[in-house]
Amino acid sequence: MPSVIFGLLALALGLLGVTAWWWSVTEFLRGAVPVALLILGLVALASGVQSVRLPRSNKGTASDPDIDG
């Protein structure tokens, strides 16, 4: 129950802060969104390069039945 009360209080104060300092929020978002997109793009590029580099062999996977027991 305390977490619900804390959550509602945080939502109310957050909405109050966003409405009171709207232009500051938009300035922050205008600076933060491009930086976040750059970071997400680098992560996506790195994971794509890593998946291309990994060999695609099915030897030794757990899905293959073991004939020798």
From Swiss-Prot:
It comes from the Bacteria. It is a multi-pass membrane protein. Residues 1-2, 53-69 are cytoplasmic. The gene is mamI. It is found in: Magnetosome membrane. Residues 24-31 are lumenal. Keywords: Biomineralization, Iron, Magnetosome, Membrane, Metal-binding, Transmembrane, Transmembrane helix. The chain crosses the membrane at residues 3-23, 32-52. A short loop (residues 21-31, which is probably in the magnetosome lumen) when inserted into a Salmonella flagellin protein (FliC) binds magnetite, which may be used to purify particular forms of magnetite. GO terms for molecular function: metal ion binding. Essential for magnetosome formation. May bind magnetite. May be involved in an early stage of magnetosome nucleation. It comes from Paramagnetospirillum magneticum (strain ATCC 700264 / AMB-1) (Magnetospirillum magneticum). Its main location: membrane. Coiled coil: none annotated. Induction: Part of the probable 18 gene mamAB operon. This bacteria makes up to 20 cubo-octahedral magnetosomes of about 45 nm in diameter which contain membrane-bound crystals of magnetite (Fe(3)O(4)). Disruption phenotype: Cells have no magnetic response and no magnetosome membranes. Deletion of genes mamH to mamV (amb0961 to amb0978) gives cells with no magnetosomes and no magnetic response. This is Magnetosome protein MamI. Belongs to the magnetosome MamI protein family. GO terms for cellular component: magnetosome membrane. The keyword RNA-binding does not apply.
